[in-house]
UniProtKB/Swiss-Prot annotation:
Its EC number is 2.7.7.7. It is an enzyme of class 2 (transferase). One of its GO terms (biological process) is DNA repair. InterPro entries: DNA_pol3_alpha_NTPase_dom (IPR011708), DNA_pol3_finger (IPR040982), DnaE2 (IPR023073), DnaE2/DnaE/PolC (IPR004805), DNAPol_HHH (IPR029460), NA-bd_OB_tRNA (IPR004365), PHP_dom (IPR004013), Pol/His_phosphatase_N (IPR003141). One of its GO terms (cellular component) is cytoplasm. The gene is dnaE2. SMART domains: POLIIIAc. This is Error-prone DNA polymerase. SUPFAM superfamilies: PHP domain-like (SSF89550). Keywords: Cytoplasm, DNA damage, DNA repair, DNA replication, DNA-directed DNA polymerase, Nucleotidyltransferase, Transferase. It comes from Pseudomonas putida (strain ATCC 47054 / DSM 6125 / CFBP 8728 / NCIMB 11950 / KT2440). The keyword Transit peptide does not apply.
Amino acid sequence: MAAGLVRMNTPGYAELHCLSNFSFQRGASSADELFRRAREQGYQALAITDECTLAGIVRAWQAAKVHQLRLIVGSEVQLCDGPKLVLLVENLTGYQNLCALITRARRRAEKGAYQLFRDDLLLHHQGLLALWVAADSGDTATGAWLRSVFAERLWLAVHLHRGSDDAVRLQRLRALAADVGIRAVACGDVHMHVRGRRALQDCMTAIRQHCQVSEAGRFLFANGERHLRSQAQLAELYPLDLLAETLVIARRCQFDLSELNYQYPRELVPEGHTPASWLRELCEQGMPLRWPDGPSGKVRDVLAKELGLIEELGYESYFLTVHDIVAFARSQRILCQGRGSAANSVVCFVLGITELDPMKHHLLFERFLSRERNEPPDIDVDFEHDRREEVIQYVFRRYGRHRAALTAVVNTYHAAGAVRDVARALGLPADQVDALAKCCGRWSDRIPDDQRLAEAGFEAGSPSLRRVLVLAGELIGFPRHLSQHPGGFVISQQPLDQLVPVENAAMPERTVIQWDKDDLDMVGLLKVDVLALGMLSALRRCFDQLQHHRGRHLTLATIPSEDPATYAMISRAETMGVFQIESRAQMAMLPRLRPQKFYDLVIEVAIVRPGPIQGDMVHPYLRRRLKQEPVTYPSPQLKEVFERTLGVPLFQEQVMELAMVAADYTPGEADQLRRSMAAWKRHGGLEPHRERLVQGMLRNGYTLAFAERIFEQIKGFGSYGFPESHAASFALLCYASSWLKCHEPAIFTCALVNSWPMGFYSPDQLLQEARRQGIEVRPVDVCHSDWDCTLEPDAEGTLAIRMGLRLVRGLAEADAKRVQQARSQRPWRNVEDLCLRAGLDARARARLADGGALRALASDRHQARWQVAAVQPQLPLFADVQALPEEPVQLPVPTVGEDLMADYQTLGTTLGPHPLALLRARLRALGCRSSSELQGVEHGDNIAVAGLVVGRQRPQTASGVTFVTLEDEHGMVNVVVWRALAERQRRALVGSQLLKVSGRLEQENGVRHLIARRLEDVSPLLQGLDVRSRDFH
């Protein structure tokens, strides 16, 4: 039969069984690829039926709208006690039942698995159409049971893939359908949009089965027929009535995700109030706390405007929900602060959600909420990182697990992971797999080029290597698995599984929905971000210690503002441990920018970011700040927008204001411009604004050159344009931590170490910095140390830091707590008394002895190890028998070097001499200067230094430059390694613990760094000292 005749007689087709890449290592094509191809093939509809998941259905919905093809929502499931089915959603009831089925199946199984039974179908089958995927010899009893459940909503799926037995298979399946009394329908069991994805699909199958493709055997498909075939090809395989039946089913499936009716929680509103009246009441209660002398008329006007828009858009319950969570945290003395665009809102400020007065800082409300956008605002709240779980569990208790769950995060393949998985699947040796994966950047989405491959010892033209790289390139960006969002909550009035499936999280006592934040935005579901921030934990500890040791009660709101000493410290870049300005890039900027007031900190936080740097905004701003070029404005109207930043746009809000003032954008249009800035590289979303923006500016009298330059600067924001509200929220924590470091450095350092892990620096670096500042740091001692580091005042009130037992590597907190509890009853008599009364096992005793924590009871580590080894469990029969005194054993005292080595191995730090102090003579012989000697070196001089590598950073803004931080006995040396040198001497750069650097010293505006010319690994000089860098590996 001619192909043209086949096409004429084809009744049309809808694919009812198709897996996307959200089937996680089964489907080899994205929803966008599938819908584009289905549209090209003239399909009437396409069902996405990923196995027991709806994780990709929102993206499929978006793809369907883009390609103007109808989506049928569905899922493939395998019953534990029954057949394989494809369930298709007919209406809203069917969608709710499918969500409930998937939820049941996922919640009763381990993460990544599911268990679904016949009884589940009996409870949740209404509104669902079922396609029975039966073997050729499927039993009629199963069919009869299915028909009893689904009645006329049951079909037999017929999959034909050009197998040698297609004709027999078709005949048997038709007979089975007739025996059961149901209709048959054509299905493709589609796993890819085109045949060309067959190799990737085979590879993904091997990855899923944890084997090589050559070993996958029966798990692989026999051919590449599971793609979206043309209707002519389908007509060659299927009888026309089976093809026509696909359209009958498609016409019945009328559900659309736009039908979801999300409802906010309602129980937060007391009797006698509406959500709107209760929100207004809470705002009235909050105003005296924010403005003790009463709010100004302008504040009341803005508050009324915000409340009016919130009520108009129906978001009152959203604000009440966030307020309730924050109120709980404050009731438990958990420090928290809203950040991001919420800081633009006066309502959030008076509710206590944010700590920054948006009126005082001229923040733009439209960045937070606008009528045109008509979607829920996004409120992010940071909580102390070590107490956030209390807040998460409160939300679960408050709303129940059936109404509250965490959002998902879609973990996708980056280049390294894709290369690693594909290379394994294709059978490359393990050492080659590792070497090839290391050729990719950690988070890069680019396959390594030929030069990088050659440097790693690969033959770039090798066919086997090319195959790995091609398939890995196809896999990049595919979903790998779902994980839980750190704290993004979805909370609803109705059970969540009426909206989206819910499954168990990897962590106990948590549940997670199958959608991520982008999915939620698309369907309009409420999300509250309960995030963790280590600095809040440290600040709360600081405030507690200030109250205890100084009798001074401070909060974020009452820390003395605009303190000259604090800004002087910041301008000297003495900011180790300070929030947001402790990185080497920030420290290099501080002496140039020299912050003198709070808004300078807002700029400092925002300026060392990809957006301002790539938009060429940093250097013009600095030149104007240093009065090296005049401050000019294109018009008086734009002066109001840019005056705070000296005529240079630095913030997203300024771009929005510019568009409104200079190009006549409405606030909602300006917000769409902001959103497009973030997406333009991925979706080209900014180009439609070029003409609108440029023409609007030309109409208002601006030059074409100025308009084009502004547009290019806006594109720079696409990488990471920082919101002013976000920078201001962070600047508040930056200032608070700076003030504490300046005025209470012992308290600040103690709090940082107790809150670790957080920030850039290890406890060793923080404690050594404290010692350089003249703060006494006292050793770990079972006679004085608690689990946390503590503060011990002397007679004059000067505080010393007592190192806590938390620093002893391998010691459990429970053991430390038992030491504290037993010691509170009476002092230790000796090592044996400690071990027995504290109930320490052999492991805990050894950790304390090795960590030097027993010096007060045993003179040194050698004696301590000997004495803990001699402790015998006390048996009840001999409890009152006095042991015979033993002769003390004289052991050699450890050398300084041995103690130093043991300190680093067991504590990660030392209170003895710095390792480089012991090596200084040998380093001088190698021509190395110390950090303290650099003050006398002239700009441009060639010198050599050596130090412990305590940090390596390669910011994405730095064009491949690596910043290395070296530490010696006097301080830090900042080293700049250009890309060419880094690639040439990668082994020394990446692998050194003790690094010698030769290069040229540069000094400008108080910033000093060494431009590396040669790197040399001199780690053998350490003779095994345990010093670990914190870097980008």
